[in-house]
């Protein structure tokens, strides 16, 4: 904590955001359990005098702010800022104020509150997109934040927290690039069960789009990770080749808080594959590309997403690119850090979870009488997170059982890790 007379410590179990909380009252004293059950996330924000502030998801899937008052050796919890309909992405305390980054349909919205939890103002942002930054101390009066989106390279602004005014401090400039030559929009589509899924669609502004337009769809959908608007040179290169780039914000992520994550994990994992498949169906129905012009791409958990969705819907895509993917769902937990992913996937050592994993495990669902899309399987020689055997086994079996003339390639990068 700020006065160094006490310390807060978090204890986690597996790859799970829930944690226990312990407090050390002085440098040489023992840690005292404050939250001794895995009932939510507790993340320390800052402290002042005898008050410690935390972000928590206990009883608040979208997150809320609480404080812990230390009074005569006892602990008193108080709710400071209640849960909102929008998920909290980050919280900072600067100039005796909370600066909270909320996600509203995947876009950042910045709200400022005083330390009593009273709303002060909503920041008027320079652009719609993803905001990061706001580092600083409780007594600082200024800070910096960055903004980006699918067509805007990173811009950094300096903000005065006394009046919430800000000015451009720096921006990334690319030779020959003009963001006004591109467009990006957010739409929503129904998944298999009717759930509305956000999807960002970006391309050159003057592009004439039809069923022949090249379409690349990206997804992740797992581990409470939000995939937010972000500028990428490789995405821009695709757009410059007259392609449409789409990012589906699938269940399993954190875009709408813990409930969105839980709807795409464990026995609900199939929802994620359905969400991804219905993204292509939605775009094709709007005459944005067609199965013969569509590629899907994803990395790590997204590699699982691409492989599983491609196997379940081979007629939807021309090309699939599962990168460094988790592809053997019955043995992923036997290698390196794989055991930690059981929180999202489940364990093959538990009967009902085994049956669920077997139903979608890419390695175990390749059929011999199906023509699959052209597939580029990538892995890395020193990947100690998702070991290369996932990709090697999947690619070999796909090559063996492929029933038509489309091909699968394996690309091994040397000597790299999980990237």
Can you name each region flagged by the protein language model?
Residues 1-8, 12, 411-419:
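Single conserved hydrophobic/aromatic residue that forms the stacking wall/gate
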Residues 2, 25-42, 69-92, 116-133, ...:
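Multi-bladed beta-propeller domains
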Residues 2, 6-10, 33, 37-55, ...:
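Conserved beta-propeller blade repeats
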Residues 13-14, 57, 103, 148:
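Short loop/turn segments immediately following the C-termini of beta-strands
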Residues 16-22, 60-66, 106-111, 152-157:
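Structural motif
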Residues 53, 62, 142-165:
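Structured, non-catalytic alpha/beta "coupling" segments that mediate domain-domain communication
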Residues 170-292, 299, 334, 338:
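Cap/lid segment of the alpha/beta-hydrolase catalytic domain
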Residues 247-412:
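Active-site-proximal cap/loop segments of hydrolase catalytic domains
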């Amino acid at each position: 904590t700020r006065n160094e007379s006490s310390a807060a410590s978090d204890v986690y179990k597996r790859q799970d955001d829930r944690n226990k909380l312990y407090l050390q009252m002085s440098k040489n004293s023992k840690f005292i359990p404050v939250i001794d059950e895995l009932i939510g996330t507790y993340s320390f924000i800052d402290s002042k005098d005898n008050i410690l502030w935390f972000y928590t998801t206990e009883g608040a899937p979208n997150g809320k702010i609480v404080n812990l008052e230390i009074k005569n050796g006892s602990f008193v919890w108080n709710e400071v800022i209640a849960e909102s309909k929008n998920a909290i992405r980050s919280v900072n305390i600067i100039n005796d104020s909370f600066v909270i980054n909320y996600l509203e349909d995947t876009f950042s919205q910045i709200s400022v509150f005083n330390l009593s939890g009273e709303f002060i103002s909503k920041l008027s942002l320079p652009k719609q997109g993803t905001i990061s930054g706001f580092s600083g101390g409780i007594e600082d009066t200024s800070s910096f934040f960055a903004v980006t989106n699918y067509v805007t390279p990173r811009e950094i602004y300096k903000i005065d927290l006394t009046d919430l005014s800000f000015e451009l401090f720096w921006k990334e400039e690319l030779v020959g690039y003009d963001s006004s030559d591109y467009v990006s929009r957010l739409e929503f589509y129904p998944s298999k069960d009717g759930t509305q899924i956000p999807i960002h669609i970006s391309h050159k502004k003057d592009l004439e789009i039809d069923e022949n337009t090249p379409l690349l769809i990206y997804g992740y959908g797992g581990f409470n990770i939000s995939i937010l608007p972000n500028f990428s040179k490789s995405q821009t290169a695709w757009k410059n080749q007259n392609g449409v780039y789409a990012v589906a914000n699938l269940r399993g992520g954190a875009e709408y808080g813990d409930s969105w994550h839980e709807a795409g994990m464990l026995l609900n994992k199939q929802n994620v594959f359905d969400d991804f498949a219905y993204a292509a169906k939605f775009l094709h129905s709007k005459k944005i590309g067609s199965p013969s012009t569509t590629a899907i791409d994803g990395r790590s958990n997204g590699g699982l997403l691409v492989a599983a969705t491609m196997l379940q819907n081979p007629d939807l895509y021309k090309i699939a690119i599962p990168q460094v993917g988790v592809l053997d769902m019955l043995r992923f937990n036997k290698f390196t850090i794989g055991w930690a992913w059981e929180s999202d996937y489940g364990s093959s050592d538990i009967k009902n979870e085994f049956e669920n994993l077997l139903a979608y495990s890419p390695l175990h669902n390749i059929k011999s009488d199906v023509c699959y899309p052209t597939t580029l399987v990538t892995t890395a020689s020193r990947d100690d997170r998702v070991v290369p055997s996932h990709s090697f086994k999947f690619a070999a079996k796909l090559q063996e059982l492929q029933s038509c003339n489309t091909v699968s390639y394996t690309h091994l990068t040397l000597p790299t890790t999980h990237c």
